[in-house]
Amino acid sequence: MKKLSLMLLLVVCFTLALTGCGGGEKKTEAPKDAPKKAEAQVLNIYSWADYFDPQVLAEFEKANNCRINYDVYSNNEELLAKMQAGGALFDIIQPSDYMVTTMIQLNMLEKLDHSKLPNVQANLIESLKHPAYDQKQEYDIPYVRGITGIAYNKKYVKDPITSWADLWKPEYKGHIILLNDNREVFSLALKKLGKSNNSTDPKEVEAAFNELKKLNTNVLAYDTENNKQKMIAEEAWIAHMWSGDASFCNFDNPNIQFCVPKEGTLIWADNMAIPKGAKNKELAMKFLNYIYDPKVSAKNFDYMKLPNANATAIPMQKKEIVENPILKDAAAKSNMGEWLHDIGNAITMYDKFWTELKTGK
């Protein structure tokens, strides 16, 4: 009996042990229909190179549980071509003034809901509240403003540059970078000839083209994305450059100076807009409002060292950036500039000459 009782006891204990193990397995088994973690939204930005502080972008990603995909273009025509090929792939783009007009005419931009942009309404600089290219500000928000001129390294360029005509001097052969931008490059030649940036006269545009063919001998590269780095590293002596980029170069290399040519130049503003059919329109609106928060804007523009369109943020920025001589001189001479306009079908003439200029065909 004792043996039988012992046997029964062992069987019962063994059974209980198995049951206990089975229960443990059931407790740790994941439910078959466990909810998956929501994937982060992707905000697709198509813009100019170096146009945001990476930390400012990272902070927006963290606050909004999203990821930012950032792609760059070299000029407005490249942006337009990409948009025509499928602009809904992007949520935010940054066209310049005249390109905003073109895109509005082509129905490429979403109208903005300004009730969701209180930071913009409160902080946008007064001079850009009703720009000629979008007077009611229905489709865009100004972001960066500036003027185009000539940056030069005084270590190599002994006589200060004062004129567009100086670029043609033979001693600068192989030492000049021009912007990789059709309208910008033709503007400098048109101004040299005393003509408007927006000329649609075939004779004037062809005359500008002939001047540019002569200038090609002196050109090291047509470059918009890396011209700052090449000037800072002294790979080039002279660059056809935007005032903000020249200021950026000057901080890293004080030998770099900036000239607003005496013949006049062009003034510009780059803007933020939302393409028609953007997949993440609400997230894009949040981003536009975020970028116009004064503290965010001050941090962003301290990084970029560009002229800020956020009036409230400017006093919050580092003094050495706001008072940089290049930016101050460019602002003082903005009356020497002419806005670019949409030139309609005349752009095909510019495009033809531009292709020939860069390829020799």
Predicted regions and their residues:
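Conserved C-terminal helix/tail region of periplasmic/extracytoplasmic solute-binding proteins
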Residues: A330-K361
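Extracytoplasmic ligand-binding site segments that recognize negatively charged/polar headgroups
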Residues: D53, L89, Q94-E235
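A ligand-binding cleft/hinge motif common to bilobed small-molecule-binding domains
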Residues: M99-T102, I232, I238-N255, K305
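Mature extracytoplasmic/periplasmic domains
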Residues: P275-S334
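Early extracytoplasmic/lumenal segment of secretory-pathway proteins
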Residues: A30-T102, Q229
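Short, low-complexity disordered leader/linker segments with a strong preference
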Residues: M1-V42, K361
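Periplasmic-binding protein-like
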Residues: E206-K214, D252-K276, V322
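Ligand-binding "clamshell"
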Residues: I104-K111, P131-E138, F248-V260, I321-N324
